[in-house]
């Protein structure tokens, strides 16, 4: 009888395999070094992870939708389950989008998650770039990562635009007609040829959506995926930036190791992002194409706006004056200038680090971030750009604003035009002066200390507020001014611990009984001291010659 073999131990098998690999290729040293890499713990560094995890959700949901979507523009008659559109002639693309929404199991849920994830992806990139811009994280040696992030934002905008154009509903068709077709036709010399190359003839043609589909599911996602991989590789190789603080220098990183803290935190954050997108996809309706109907070139609807990341271009087209220019017997209509300004923005965005380096002469390596107040010109430029974006975004919905607030549509158009010219410089000035004021506030704390709120009367009758110095004092008791290190400064006594430590309770859990009793006793003692001081003050007044009458 053969001996009975015991089942193998999985842990021992894996350990043996790992040892065999290590004896051949020696990866353990490099792997240990990489797993010990330190990442900062500031919350703003998670903004980039939101974009990354949203893109992962986009890939997963996009693959599912690809299994059921047909990008053909062949005309068919709808005979599906949605009764109001039965018998209506539409494209095969629109019919398959309706089938995904009403007949594919989980199709509407996945489609809405996909759309919300696209919005979150673009929004996260915008906020992430804003954080990098205002803190100076794009400075040398990280200019390449800024360029990659700018390209990711531009690609995300066009990827989203192509994506919501695929269903061939009335709203997406209007977007293609107004943005892609009209601007292309208006280009001098090459406009007609380029339009026929894109559409295969007159608008809308029969080949545009299949071409957009190929760009949307193959080319652009591949480029975005490659850029994300390159971005992460550069972050890993160049190490992370960090905010100034105790123990932080240009040559180290203070934070937590990749394993296990950062890895578990990132995994939990990914689960949270997926959960939030799932709730949004299940509870918040977005892009109800069945209410819009199929695209018909003869039908135009008011209240037509693109997604938020393209609304600034729509607003620019709405408020741009109807100026026509003539150059070498060619007409340049107003919509072409929208494309020109878009191109200018798309060039200035990735080029900004090099422009700032050129004008400031700062060619040094930087691993410590800056507070926005410490760089008022850059902060003011960023605030001006945000104001420009917000004005154009609001201008994109001027018809809805005019309808809801009973304002003339022409008035909203002129408000947008005036705001585009006046508001950005005004915001620049206010932001610049605000930063200067914050700098002076920091210098005041370093020179005089923190305001205590205690008013003291001097022997000659003047009143002053006492300050708590942050450092040593001279022989006269005056604070010795400290040097600003770029880190946040305490502005209130509570920051120095004068209010004591907070209780262990929270919004959901009360303090412990012993801690609650101690807090009550301390509060009662403080009240008794205040009453005693008040009585002493009143007695001194009553006992004075002025108080005897």
UniProtKB/Swiss-Prot annotation:
Was identified as a high-confidence drug target. It is a multi-pass membrane protein. It catalyses: a quinol + 2 Fe(III)-[cytochrome c](out) = a quinone + 2 Fe(II)-[cytochrome c](out) + 2 H(+)(out). Its cofactor is heme. Heme 2 binds at residues 128, 231. The gene is qcrB. The keyword Iron applies. One of its GO terms (cellular component) is membrane. It is an enzyme of class 7 (translocase). Inhibited by the anti-tuberculous drug Q203, an optimized imidazopyridine amide (IPA) compound. Q203 triggers a rapid ATP depletion in M.tuberculosis grown under an aerobic or anaerobic atmosphere. Also inhibited by LPZS (lansoprazole sulfide), a metabolite of LPZ (lansoprazole) generated by intracellular sulfoxide reduction into the host cytoplasm; LPZS is a potent anti-mycobacterial agent that inhibits growth of intracellular M.tuberculosis with good activity against drug-resistant isolates. Heme 1 binds at residues 114, 216. Belongs to the cytochrome b family. Cytochrome b subunit of the cytochrome bc1 complex, an essential component of the respiratory electron transport chain required for ATP synthesis. The bc1 complex catalyzes the oxidation of ubiquinol and the reduction of cytochrome c in the respiratory chain. The bc1 complex operates through a Q-cycle mechanism that couples electron transfer to generation of the proton gradient that drives ATP synthesis. The cytochrome b subunit contains two ubiquinol reactive sites: the oxidation (QP) site and the reduction (QN) site. GO terms for molecular function: metal ion binding; ubiquinol-cytochrome-c reductase activity. It is found in: Cell membrane. Binds 2 heme groups non-covalently per subunit. This is Cytochrome bc1 complex cytochrome b subunit. Changing residue 176 to P: Confers resistance to LPZS. Remains susceptible to IPA. Its EC number is 7.1.1.8. Changing residue 313 to A: Confers resistance to Q203 and IPA. Remains susceptible to LPZS. Keywords: Cell membrane, Electron transport, Heme, Iron, Membrane, Metal-binding, Respiratory chain, Translocase, Transmembrane, Transmembrane helix, Transport. GO terms for biological process: respiratory electron transport chain. It comes from Mycobacterium tuberculosis (strain ATCC 25618 / H37Rv). Pfam families: Cytochrom_B_N_2.
């Amino acid at each position: 009888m053969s001996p009975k073999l015991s089942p193998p131990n999985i842990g021992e098998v894996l350990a043996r395999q790992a040892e065999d690999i290590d004896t051949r290729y020696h990866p353990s040293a490099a792997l240990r070094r990489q797993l010990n890499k330190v990442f900062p713990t500031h919350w703003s560094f998670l903004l980039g992870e939101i974009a990354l995890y949203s893109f992962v959700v986009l890939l997963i949901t996009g693959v599912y939708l690809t299994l059921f979507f047909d990008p053909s523009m062949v005309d068919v008659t709808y005979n599906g389950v949605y009764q109001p559109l039965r018998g209506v002639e539409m494209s095969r693309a629109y019919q398959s989008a309706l089938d995904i929404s009403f007949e594919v199991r989980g199709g509407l849920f996945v489609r809405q998650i996909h759309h919300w994830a696209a919005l979150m992806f673009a929004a996260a990139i915008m906020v992430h770039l804003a954080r990098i811009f205002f803190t100076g994280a794009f400075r040398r040696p990280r200019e390449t990562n800024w360029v990659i992030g700018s390209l990711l934002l531009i690609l995300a905008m066009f990827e989203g635009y192509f994506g919501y154009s695929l269903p061939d509903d009335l709203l997406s068709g209007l977007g293609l007609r107004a943005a892609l077709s009209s601007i292309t036709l208006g280009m001098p010399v090459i406009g007609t040829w380029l339009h026929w190359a894109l559409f295969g003839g007159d608008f809308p043609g029969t080949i545009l959506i299949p071409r957009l589909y190929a760009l949307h599911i193959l080319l652009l996602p591949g480029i975005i995926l490659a850029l994300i991989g390159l971005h992460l590789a550069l972050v890993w190789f160049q190490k992370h930036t960090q905010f100034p603080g105790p123990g932080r220098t240009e040559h180290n990183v203070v934070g937590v190791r990749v394993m296990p803290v950062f890895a578990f935190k990132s995994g939990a954050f990914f689960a949270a992002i997926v959960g939030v997108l799932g709730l949004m996809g299940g509870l918040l309706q977005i892009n109800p194409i069945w209410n819009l109907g199929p695209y018909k070139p003869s039908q135009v609807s008011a209240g037509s706006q693109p997604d938020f990341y393209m609304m600034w271009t729509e607003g620019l087209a709405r408020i741009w004056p109807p100026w026509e220019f003539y150059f070498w017997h060619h007409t340049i209509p107003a919509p072409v200038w929208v494309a020109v300004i878009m191109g200018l923005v798309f060039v200035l965005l990735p080029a900004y680090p090099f422009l700032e380096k050129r004008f400031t002469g700062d060619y040094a390596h930087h691993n410590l971030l800056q507070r926005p107040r410490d760089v008022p010109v850059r902060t003011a430029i960023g605030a001006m750009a945000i104001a420009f974006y917000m004005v154009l975004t609001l201008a994109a919905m001027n018809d809805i604003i005019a309808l809801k607030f009973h304002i003339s549509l022409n008035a909203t158009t002129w408000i947008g035009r005036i705001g585009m010219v006046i508001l950005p410089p005004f915001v620049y000035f206010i932001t610049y002066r605000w930063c200067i004021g914050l700098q002076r506030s920091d210098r005041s704390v370093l020179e005089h200390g923190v305001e205590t709120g205690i008013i003291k009367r001097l022997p000659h009758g003047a009143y002053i507020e006492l300050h708590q110095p942050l450092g040593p004092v001279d022989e006269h008791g005056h604070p010795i001014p400290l040097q600003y290190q770029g880190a946040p400064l305490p502005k209130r006594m509570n920051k120095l611990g004068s209010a004591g430590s907070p209780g262990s309770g929270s919004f959901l859990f009360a303090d412990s009984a012993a801690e609650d009793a101690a807090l009550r006793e301390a509060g009662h003692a403080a009240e008794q001291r205040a009453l005693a001081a008040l009585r002493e003050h009143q007695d001194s007044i009553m006992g004075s010659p002025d108080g005897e009458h």
